[in-house]
Regions:
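Mixed-charge interfacial surface used for oligomerization/domain docking
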Residues: 2-4, 12-33, 37, 87, ...
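N-terminal glycine-rich anion-binding loop in soluble enzyme alpha/beta folds
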Residues: 6-68, 72
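Short coil/turn segments at secondary-structure boundaries
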Residues: 60-68, 90-97, 124-125
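Ligand-binding "clamshell"
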Residues: 64, 115-119
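N-terminal glycine-rich phosphate/adenylate-binding segment common to multiple enzyme folds
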Residues: 72-99
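Arginine/glycine-rich "motif VI" loop of SF2 helicases in the C-terminal RecA-like domain
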Residues: 111
Length: 298
């Protein structure tokens, strides 16, 4: 299929690489480091990569992530420009400064190739919510929308992609300093699951806590009903992802399909990749959907 422009993104979309390849969406891969060894956030290309990563966490090793530098973006963008004009949707600035390097690279290449269109957009989205935004942009591209039309849709709708999630394992939150050791211990003893979402700047915010996974699922489903476009009649894209807890993800999907009948059999299930997993750790389950404008949160 001939397309009007190239649409690209980063590996933190937490969708399978094979799916992105089928959709003709080039991906810039993030990396993480354990000890003195660097590993790629490979999106399922190597079946051993994700178990190896979570094995590191189980051993108490702390993966280090870093921003993608300008040089890496220059190389990636220049390769894409061989195929046409470029729209790159970047990982949220609320969790990484990489988008600023992407924008710098875009400006440098715009000067080098003045006849090309190069647009870089901060997605304000993360994980498979970021994936949902990119996937919908690909639908527009494939339906014949121009780069400008697609970019404007992304800008208008990026803050309508809701990210609702909970975690039943506070270990990695403690290791990365997001919660204190005492708070993590109490949460574990009391079986407390923090309820979280992304704010309007694409940053993670905790806004509640419940005891037990079942209550966490109900709270998450209630939040989706409150914010989803159409309420219980929601019938747009819906992605669920998890970090090494498929049974919990299945429990959430079952509850979503019961509450939102038009989603039955249509929810895409994905793994949380190594970059997002470096911060969430195991035991996190999330749902992503289109809704009203995400609120600002202190």
């Amino acid at each position: 299929m001939e397309r009007n422009f190239v649409l690209s993104c980063c590996s933190t979309v937490d969708l399978p690489y094979a799916y992105m390849a089928r959709r003709d969406i080039p991906v810039l891969f993030y990396h993480y480091v354990v000890g003195d060894q660097e590993y790629v956030d490979d999106m399922g290309r190597d079946p051993a990569a994700l178990p190896r990563f979570y094995g590191f966490l189980k051993e108490g090793k702390l993966p280090q992530t870093s921003q993608v530098n300008v040089a890496a973006y220059l190389d990636f963008f220049e390769e894409q420009l061989k195929k046409g004009d470029l729209l790159h949707i970047a990982f949220t600035s609320g969790q990484s400064g990489s988008v600023h390097n992407a924008m710098t690279a875009g400006k440098l290449l715009q000067e080098k190739y003045p006849d090309k269109k190069i647009v870089v957009i901060d997605s304000l989205c993360s994980s498979s919510g970021y994936g949902l935004l990119v996937d919908t942009a690909a639908d527009m591209r494939d339906s014949g929308a121009t780069l400008e039309e697609t970019a404007q849709w992304v800008l208008d709708n990026r803050n309508k992609v809701h990210h609702q999630f909970f975690s039943s394992d506070m270990t990695q939150f403690r290791r990365t300093g997001r919660v204190s050791g005492a708070a993590a211990m109490v949460a574990t003893i009391m079986n407390i699951c923090p309820i979280m979402r992304l704010d309007d700047k694409g940053a993670i915010k905790a806004y509640g806590k419940v005891r037990g996974k079942k209550k966490a699922v109900v709270t998450t489903v209630n939040a989706m009903e409150e914010h989803a476009q159409g309420g219980r009649d929601y019938d747009q894209k819906c992605f669920v992802c998890h970090s090494q807890c498929p049974e919990d993800a299945r429990m959430l999907i079952d509850a979503l399909e019961e509450r939102f009948p038009k989603l039955k059999g249509k929810i895409r299930l994905c793994d949380i990749g190594t970059i997002i997993g470096s911060h969430s750790g195991p035991g996190t389950v999330a749902v992503f959907f289109m809704g009203d404008e995400r609120p600002a949160m202190d």
